[in-house]
Curated annotation (Swiss-Prot):
<dbReference type="GO" id="GO:0008933">
    <property type="term" value="F:peptidoglycan lytic transglycosylase activity"/>
</dbReference>
<dbReference type="GO" id="GO:0009279">
    <property type="term" value="C:cell outer membrane"/>
</dbReference>
<dbReference type="InterPro" id="IPR008258">
    <property type="entry name" value="Transglycosylase_SLT_dom_1"/>
</dbReference>
<feature type="active site">
    <location>
        <position position="313"/>
    </location>
</feature>
<dbReference type="Pfam" id="PF01464">
    <property type="entry name" value="SLT"/>
</dbReference>
<keyword id="KW-0472">Membrane</keyword>
<keyword id="KW-0961">Cell wall biogenesis/degradation</keyword>
<dbReference type="GO" id="GO:0071555">
    <property type="term" value="P:cell wall organization"/>
</dbReference>
<dbReference type="Pfam" id="PF00497">
    <property type="entry name" value="SBP_bac_3"/>
</dbReference>
<comment type="similarity">
    <text>In the C-terminal section; belongs to the transglycosylase Slt family.</text>
</comment>
<keyword id="KW-0732">Signal</keyword>
<dbReference type="InterPro" id="IPR001638">
    <property type="entry name" value="Solute-binding_3/MltF_N"/>
</dbReference>
<protein>
    <recommendedName>
        <fullName>Membrane-bound lytic murein transglycosylase F</fullName>
        <ecNumber>4.2.2.n1</ecNumber>
    </recommendedName>
</protein>
<dbReference type="GO" id="GO:0016998">
    <property type="term" value="P:cell wall macromolecule catabolic process"/>
</dbReference>
<keyword id="KW-0998">Cell outer membrane</keyword>
<keyword id="KW-0456">Lyase</keyword>
<feature type="region of interest" description="LT domain">
    <location>
        <begin position="269"/>
        <end position="486"/>
    </location>
</feature>
């Protein structure tokens, strides 16, 4: 998975030109009520989607996801309320569109020519490749000719179109089946669990799921990069499309689209099986000893984020000591510990409390111009590198015409702090900026793993409890001296 190759300037220019070209076809100019008028009259933008960590998910009733946030911003742009309509599979999405039960589909859908008979597409907002996956430990196929097992893909997915084309053009013996009951995410999970031989997925979703299911392995790329886009109803009315183009153009111009892409996709590129497997094992075997302390002292920080910071620092080893003298779960220096009132750096609770306080102080110290949802990454860079060096990275960003308040811009300048071409001109001099870059990226990856892994455990526990409850109804416990029918 990589970012769209086109420059954001090009996207914005194309959006503007298309909007101008569509101007004559906007219905309100002819006295008709168009799609956009209907949405505004209703006061709601109905968006159909599919549950997935990347697309749309909820934790404690708080929604998140790339498509969700983008749709929420579009609804705000239109001045209406966002109504999310989750569906289980892609066929249901397009049926809802056909039946006028939704206004647009925002579900990480790959651009597909076959779908153009049923729907229109909006602008692309990121790109992915289609990949064939298998379970690690099984023989790795190098092409479709090497497959020795069953291939199943989600019904209605772009993967079906791809497989049909490959069968017609290159692999006449290729066979597969489609599943109506299982979503693409569920099929990927089945491969990871050894319940299915192969399936196809998009590179972004696979990269995220590997953080939770490290046994999920990529055999090969099936396609080149393809755009991901929204879909909406076919119509001669261009009002909604024109509004969408204006919205995307604005998102590109102010950098919001790049920041959103960074938030959900900027840290998922590299995958280390051993590191991920080791971390998931530590969640089961080590984290329970300290979880209550992370929850107790997290304050305004998500306890899970505080926990993964500690893992990045010490691998949850309270006795950890570095060659430079930092110690404990949160790897505090003596000077920092003294300033926080931490008397014993290897005491787990003192270390966690001190680290949480220090991080919150850094967040409050940051310039107010930094967006709320990006402040934590700047604070973590300062936690690792030092506040002054983080400010140097912001200055470098501004001097190079980047946005010093955007993490996606600043993180790319962190490695420059160790390069002779740049650090002599900084206020605080040389710093291992590349280490701070990796530090923050690792924490973000661990956070994806921890949040997703705990959600999976909760889901399985709930399913197990439901099964137990059902079995209890079927086989009621009979006390001594009682019989069924008494």
């Amino acid at each position: 998975m990589t970012r769209i190759k086109l420059s954001y300037f090009t996207i914005g220019l194309v959006a503007l030109l298309l909007a101008l070209a569509l101007w004559p076809n906007i219905p309100w100019r002819n006295g008709q009520e168009g799609q956009l008028d209907q949405i505004k009259a209703r006061g709601e933008l109905r968006v159909s989607t599919i549950s997935s960590p990347l697309i749309y998910s909820t934790e404690k009733d708080t929604p998140s996801g790339f498509d969700y946030e983008l749709a929420k911003r579009f609804a705000d742009y239109l001045g209406v309320k966002l109504v999310i309509i989750p569906h289980h599979n892609i066929d249901d999405l397009f049926d809802a569109l056909d039946n006028d039960d939704t206004d647009l589909l925002a579900a990480g859908l790959i651009y597909n020519r076959e779908r153009l008979n049923r729907a229109r597409t909006g602008p692309a907002y990121y790109s992915v490749s289609q990949q064939l996956v298998y379970r690690l430990g099984s023989p790795r196929p190098k092409s479709f000719s090497d497959l020795k097992g069953q291939v199943v893909v989600a019904s209605g997915s772009a993967h079906m179109t791809t497989l049909k084309r490959l069968k017609q053009t290159k692999y006449p013996e290729l066979n597969w089946s489609s599943s109506v009951d299982k979503s693409g995410k569920e099929l990927l999970e089945q491969v990871a669990e050894g319940k299915l031989d192969y399936t196809l997925g998009d590179s972004a979703t696979i990269a995220l799921l590997q953080r939770i299911h490290p046994q999920l392995a990529v055999a090969f790329d099936v396609t080149d990069e393809e755009p991901v886009t929204w879909y909406f109803k076919q119509s001669d009315d261009d009002s909604l499309y024109a509004a969408m183009l204006d919205f995307y153009s604005e998102m590109v111009e102010d950098g919001s689209l790049a920041r959103l892409e960074e938030k959900y996709l900027g840290h998922v590129g590299s995958f280390d099986y051993v590191d991920t497997k080791t971390f998931l094992s530590a969640i089961d075997n080590v984290l329970p000893s300290y979880q209550h302390l992370f929850e107790k002292h997290a304050g305004d920080i998500d306890w899970k984020l505080l926990a993964v910071i500690a893992y990045q620092e010490s691998h949850w080893n309270p006795q950890a000591t570095s060659p430079t003298g930092v110690r404990g779960l949160m790897m505090l220096t003596r000077v920092t510990a003294d300033g926080l009132g931490v008397k014993d750096r290897v005491d787990p609770e003192e270390s966690i409390r001190g680290g949480a306080i220090y991080l919150q102080r850094l967040m409050k110290k940051l310039p107010e111009t930094i967006p709320e949802d990006e402040r934590i990454w700047f604070a973590l860079a300062a936690y690792n590198l030092g506040y002054g060096h983080m400010l140097d990275a912001r200055r470098l960003t501004k001097n190079q015409n980047g946005n010093p308040d955007s993490w996606v811009d600043v993180k790319m300048r962190l490695p420059m702090l160790s390069q002779k071409r740049y650090y002599p001109s900084t206020t605080y001099g040389y710093a291992r900026g590349h280490e701070a870059y990796n530090y923050v990226e690792n924490i973000r990856r661990y956070q994806v793993s921890l949040v997703g892994y705990l959600q999976e455990k909760e889901k399985k526990a709930a399913q197990h409890a439901a099964i137990e409850a059902e079995l209890g109804k079927s086989n009621p416990v009979v006390g001594p001296g009682w019989s069924i029918g008494d």
